[in-house]
Amino acid sequence: MGSIKIPIETSARHIHISREDFEKLFGEGKELTFVKELSQPGQYLAKERVTIAGPRGTFENVAILGPFRKETQVELSLTDTRKIGVAGVIRQSGDVADTPGCKLIAGDRELEIERGVIVAKRHIHMTPGDAVKMRLKDNEEVFVITQSFDRALIYANVVVRISWDYRLSMHVDTDEANAFASDVAPTGAILKLFDGQTYSLQQWADEIQSGINR
């Protein structure tokens, strides 16, 4: 069986917001206004927008993605973090401990969040069925080679996230997408060893260490 093609999607800067923070910015009792579904089941683009402000700059008209989250999370690229003057901390979604904060602005309302600004670690969403086919485990890290134009890249540290609520796709930010000259519908494939096993970071590290020890 050949390699499974994984759709690669580019995530521009956006925010996941808690109900409490949303009401502080848009008014008590207000709800997110649905605009369109996203590729992952249950996720959607909302009509409401915010401005993100840091010590050195701002980004206006930043998209909010629904539904509400337990805690507000702002996802930027490393280039974005440098532009507004906040530390670029690479994390998996939901892991916001010890991350920088920023100011959120909606009209004449402002809210300072103490943490929650992250650079999302590149990752693949897949179902348990996909994982069985590719012989992968949740939170395993793999190599993915992109298939796009004449600037294909091999990405390491790609986290596998498995749930029946997911649809197969790899998510990268705008910095990463620009690096491999993303086309209209880019795809990637998980690299395999010669025996057909998934080429994981641990296997790669073990092979290097084995070579050093020879």
Indicate residue ranges for each PLM-predicted region.
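Short, charged beta-turn/beta-strand-edge "cap" motif at the junction between a beta-strand
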Residues: 110, 148-151, 194-198
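Helix-rich terminal scaffold detector
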Residues: 203-214
